[in-house]
């Protein structure tokens, strides 16, 4: 078979994900065109804030409590 149907959650949304070539599992082609949704500036700002706080708040906590993690 030159194209194998990849069973995943996209089938529930009536999309089929197909391998483009045998032996190239990283390259997939979708059966529908890509969506053209443009993010608003507010959505972009919220996404950036969430992204950076997800990584910087735990790092700041660890760095501020470093003497306790070392074992004094």
Curated annotation (Swiss-Prot):
Provide the disulphide bond pattern.
none
Question: Topological domains (Mitochondrial matrix): residue ranges?
Answer: 30-40
Q: Which GO terms describe its biological process?
A: mitochondrial electron transport, cytochrome c to oxygen
The membrane topology noted for this protein in its Swiss-Prot or TrEMBL record is:
Single-pass membrane protein
| The organelle targeting sequence, given as a residue range | 1-29
Q: Which residues lie on this side of the membrane: Mitochondrial intermembrane?
A: 65-72
Coiled-coil region list: none
Q: Which UniProt keywords apply?
A: Membrane, Mitochondrion, Mitochondrion inner membrane, Transit peptide, Transmembrane, Transmembrane helix
Instruction: Give the highest taxon in the source lineage.
Output: Eukaryota
Q: Which residues cross the membrane?
A: 41-64
Q: Where in the cell is it found?
A: Mitochondrion inner membrane
Q: Which GO terms describe its cellular component?
A: mitochondrial inner membrane; mitochondrion; respiratory chain complex IV
* A Pfam match: COX8
Q: In which pathway does it act?
A: Energy metabolism; oxidative phosphorylation
Assembly and interactions? Component of the cytochrome c oxidase (complex IV, CIV), a multisubunit enzyme composed of 14 subunits. The complex is composed of a catalytic core of 3 subunits MT-CO1, MT-CO2 and MT-CO3, encoded in the mitochondrial DNA, and 11 supernumerary subunits COX4I, COX5A, COX5B, COX6A, COX6B, COX6C, COX7A, COX7B, COX7C, COX8 and NDUFA4, which are encoded in the nuclear genome.
The function of this protein is: Component of the cytochrome c oxidase, the last enzyme in the mitochondrial electron transport chain which drives oxidative phosphorylation. The respiratory chain contains 3 multisubunit complexes succinate dehydrogenase (complex II, CII), ubiquinol-cytochrome c oxidoreductase (cytochrome b-c1 complex, complex III, CIII) and cytochrome c oxidase (complex IV, CIV), that cooperate to transfer electrons derived from NADH and succinate to molecular oxygen, creating an electrochemical gradient over the inner membrane that drives transmembrane transport and the ATP synthase.
What family does this belong to?
A: Belongs to the cytochrome c oxidase VIII family.
Q: What's the name of the protein?
A: Cytochrome c oxidase subunit 8C, mitochondrial
